[in-house]
């Protein structure tokens, strides 16, 4: 990589990335915000639809998680096609199809249709998150990647901050209008904006830096120099798929994702169990853990880039998250302590999440990065099925949320140990 050593070159690079940041990151953040909101708003819908449709906790847990089965089945094909089809067509297709499917969740009538719609939502959203990581790697070098990921994936915590009060407000304010329940309105209102975003993606997302008409020829050359990867460091997808370290990364990610989505889908229920019965109040309480997550992501992404270190910046928060989640089971009956522990636990998990994705993007280079990142994400995202399902099964079997939460607390502990035990130098 060319190292800019004179002040003028450094200033030029800084100005270039300021332009790229403003052009790409806000739009991608908004897109991912709706992706996150549309996959987890079922956690609020549960508060009404479970009674309306007669779901058990186990059925809800499976339905919440089955989204990830559809996602992982179609993720690698989606991402292998992305470099050939282009980001513009890929993101537009994903946004439009998942928006339609999310809005159509209002037609769920029983457990089989619930499972079917959640599965289809996963199929149509497949490839979006790893596709964005690959897309960002086409614009950002290793020294900037963690911060770029932190900004875009800040959409997860923001989705939690906005989604709790928004979903609760829609369910309360619109209940009974036009003969629809509050949860049906919530799915409709939160799904339709994705159609607009799909159209905008077609117009706003350049497939690659060379296609960006808002960059000058000199800026494109400078960016090409910044991102230059020696031919010896480029990999085929087959070589990546045979690399054991890729699967080590994938299992660590599986553990992190299992914990994040177990909390995302069950957080309203966990807080309601502390005696909060007002839906709007519950919405505000569930936003608090995501405020911590947003702050933690920005802080840890920036710190990790500044220190040029990934392993400890990912593992230490995961260790803390395991302890905090386990500790939350000891605070039963104490609303303030429960929210505090869940907030801190959520914060640490999102810290690990944002730093984690800088590791594979530095380890895997060249055209195989799209498939390699998708492979890690595919294996890891299956944790999104098991995490919520484990809490649902444990709740149905024991009558308590605590056993499931304790099992989930072991997940970030395992992730931390895996990350600490494995060093990932740049892959040659």
Please place each PLM-identified region on the residue numbering:
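Cytoplasmic membrane-interface "Motif A"-like loop-to-helix N-cap segments
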Residues: 83-95, 305-318
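Helix-to-loop junctions at the C-terminal end of transmembrane segments
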Residues: 74-86, 296-309
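Helix-breaking motifs and short loop linkers at transmembrane-helix boundaries and internal kinks
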Residues: 54, 86, 107-113, 124, ...
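Cytoplasmic helix-loop-helix junction between adjacent transmembrane helices
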Residues: 117-154
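C-terminal transmembrane helical hairpin of 12-TM major facilitator-type secondary transporters
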Residues: 310-359
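Extracytoplasmic gate region of multi-pass secondary transporters
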Residues: 42-43, 241-298, 353, 357
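Glycine-rich segments within core transmembrane alpha-helices of 12-TM secondary carriers
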Residues: 147-171, 193-194, 377-387
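Conserved MFS/SLC helix-loop-helix module at the cytosolic interface between two early adjacent transmembrane helices
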Residues: 73-112
């Amino acid at each position: 990589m060319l190292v800019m050593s004179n002040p003028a070159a450094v200033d030029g690079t800084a100005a270039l990335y300021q332009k790229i940041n403003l052009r790409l990151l806000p739009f991608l953040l908004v897109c991912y915000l709706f992706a996150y909101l549309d996959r987890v708003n079922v956690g609020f819908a549960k508060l009404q639809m479970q009674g309306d449709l007669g779901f058990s906790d186990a059925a809800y847990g499976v339905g919440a998680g089955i989204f990830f089965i559809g996602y992982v089945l179609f993720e690698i094909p989606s991402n292998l096609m992305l470099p050939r089809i282009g980001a513009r067509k890929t993101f537009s297709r994903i946004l439009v199809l998942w928006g339609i499917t999310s809005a159509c969740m209002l037609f769920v009538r029983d457990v089989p249709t619930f499972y079917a719609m959640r599965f289809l939502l996963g199929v149509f959203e497949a490839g979006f998150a790893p596709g964005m990581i690959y897309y960002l790697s086409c614009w950002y070098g290793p020294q900037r990647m963690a911060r770029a990921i932190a900004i875009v994936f800040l959409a997860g915590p923001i989705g939690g901050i906005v989604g709790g009060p928004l979903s609760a407000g829609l369910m309360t304010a619109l209940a009974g209008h036009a003969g629809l329940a509050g949860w049906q309105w919530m799915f409709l209102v939160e799904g339709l904006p994705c159609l607009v975003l799909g159209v905008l993606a077609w117009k706003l997302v350049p497939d690659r830096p060379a296609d960006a008409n808002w960059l000058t020829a000199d800026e494109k050359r400078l960016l090409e120099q910044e991102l230059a990867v020696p031919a010896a460091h480029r990999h085929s997808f087959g070589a990546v798929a045979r690399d054991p370290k890729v699967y080590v990364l994938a299992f660590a990610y599986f553990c992190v994702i299992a914990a994040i989505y177990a909390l995302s889908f069950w957080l309203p229920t966990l807080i309601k169990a502390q005696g909060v019965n007002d839906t709007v109040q519950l919405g505000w309480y569930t936003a608090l853990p995501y405020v911590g997550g947003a702050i933690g992501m920005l802080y840890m992404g920036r710190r990790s880039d500044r220190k040029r270190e990934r392993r400890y910046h990912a593992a230490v928060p995961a260790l803390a998250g395991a302890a905090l989640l386990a500790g939350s089971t000891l605070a039963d009956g104490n609303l303030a302590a429960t929210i505090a522990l869940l907030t801190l636990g959520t914060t640490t998990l999102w810290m690990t999440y944002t730093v984690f994705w800088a590791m594979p993007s530095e380890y895997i280079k060249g055209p195989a990065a799209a498939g390699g990142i998708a492979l890690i994400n595919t294996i890891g995202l299956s944790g999104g099925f098991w995490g919520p399902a484990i809490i649902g099964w444990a709740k149905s079997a024991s009558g308590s949320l605590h056993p499931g939460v304790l099992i989930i607390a072991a997940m970030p502990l395992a992730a931390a140990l895996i990350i600490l035990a494995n060093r990932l130098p740049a892959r040659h």
